[in-house]
Amino acid sequence: MKWNETGRVWEEDHGMLDAEQVAQCERADKAEPLRAPIPTRMISNGEYMPVRQTEQQRRVEARVEELADDASRRLGISRRKFLHSSGGMAATLLAMNEVFGRFFDVSLVEMFEPAACAAAGPPRDLFVFDDQLHFVRGSKPSPAGLRAIAQGPSSAPTVKSNPFNPRGQLDERGESWGVWDPKLVGLPIDAGYAHITRFIKDVYLDSQVTIGLLSNVTASMVQIEGEKARAPRNAEEAQRAEILTAAQTAAARNFINEISGSTRMLCHGMLYVGKGNLAYIQEQIDQNEPDSWKGYNISNAAKVDNDPNSLMRQWRHDDEEVAYPTFELVQKNYERIKDRKPGFNNICVHKGLAPGPPDPLRGHPGDLPKAARDWPKLNFISYHSCIQPNFFMADTLKDIQADKLRGGVPDISWTTEYAQLVKDLPNCYAEIGTTWASSIVTFPTVAAHIMGQLMKFMGEDRILFGSDSVWYGSPQWQIEALWRFQIPEALREKYGYPALTESAKRKILGLTSAKLYGIRAVDAGSYKPVPKDYESRMSKDLKTLLEFEKVTADNMSKMKETYAALAIDPDNTRYGWMRV
């Protein structure tokens, strides 16, 4: 099916461009003369009609060409070689700043000096605490759709179109399926990309993450043989459908910390709420010693009674009968073990990324104020900052452009409302996983407003970085984007947003989380590296627990290592169709 925007209906879709449409296009690898590091026109994989290059894209392309010609002459190299270098990326970011507004901290000297380009990136001493990391147990496949949204059209044939943009809307670069992380382009999406062997490489060898918080997902539906899919009856039954169980999460944390000889990972416990789940919460505390808790309002994770046959359901933070007994148990144990687990009182809950009405059961923030006031010793960390749009921000950008306001700033559903609701509640914190990833590259205007509003209403001390990796590859591209990002002066003046200073970035990227989890050492150099031979150190018992019958070095990791050893520059070739 395809979306007809004019009639606002779904229509039959035969899947590929027809002959008449193809006649209006040209192959992207032939039609794009410049091949800048970032595309300057929309590319189609053949399943949707690309739009013509916009005026803003033409201006970016012309400016990149001008900068590249000048720089390549000065450096005595070809324009093509220049565009393949870090200088080419700097030139493209400079051109985008000139056309779209100054979103990225980049200077002219970076076009000529690779060292300057590196120096402008995240410093080596940067302490990074990634509040949201995921991997999948070995018996389950990695989710293709989440990787595809970050990888773009090269995800085909596994994923043939943007899974979160069925209407073919355009981002700020004029693309309906823009690449978030260029390093993913061309890699196959296989069932093991989010398994532990590649997870460790992506997070601890390929990024600046100092400490990572391994998260998990409370299962909402289970498939029992002979039955239709349904909500689980209890937390034990829900384990069948979890991407990672509480025991597996804790075992991975223990393994990584043991082989590195320092605290490189913390882990969540599974927040199954309700009277009927209290015994399971205590069991996790006694057996796994989680560092904090992760839950989902939208998940059927609340056991409201002790009837063994009743199904679990969704829940709210402010439900005194359902959530409060769980909060009471967490707080009671926190008083007992807080010296050993200082972040145990952090209640992290997925909020947002859910189309539909503004209901706390779907992640709306309306249930937070009462709970935060009733439980001042608990910290309520809202993952994704309650953003409602599901991975693609085109409608949000239109609302901003239409000057649709709430409290004097553009109304970004439900993030603006969230920031204003909890602004005076010091135990409420905003985590930006996926919200940041889905906006920083493709919708930088939206990213600027989100960051500006969180800083304006909640302050730089209550915003936490999370990458939601490894769904979107290594966290490094998000770390670099945040370090280089800035809120344009025009937006700051119009809406009263604070500047995103280096001090603020250091807090967001790690220092605030360090305080929440009682981490005293915030010098990245004081943490020992995860050894490169981590795979050979995995015990048979650990492999069995993580449901890997045989864990071996995957071919893709070997290919990436070979590619890096050859020091091959990316050629910026795009594949697909462009409108002519």
Label for each model-derived stretch:
Residues 1-77:
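N-terminal secretory signal peptides
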Residues 3, 7, 69-77, 96-133:
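C-terminal segment of N-terminal export signals and the immediately downstream linker at the start
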Residues 52, 139-193, 230-234, 307, ...:
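Active-site gating loops and adjacent loop-to-helix segments of metal-dependent hydrolytic enzymes
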Residues 70, 76-97, 143, 157-202, ...:
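Mid-to-C-terminal alpha-helical segments outside catalytic/metal-binding sites
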Residues 128-134, 150-191, 201-227, 264-270, ...:
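Divalent metal-dependent hydrolysis catalytic cores, especially in the metallo-beta-lactamase
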Residues 132-138, 350, 384:
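Histidine-centered divalent metal-coordination motifs
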Residues 137, 216-363:
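Active-site gating/metal-coordination segments in enzymes
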Residues 291, 300-302, 307-465, 473, ...:
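Catalytic pocket-lining loop regions of alpha/beta-barrel enzymes
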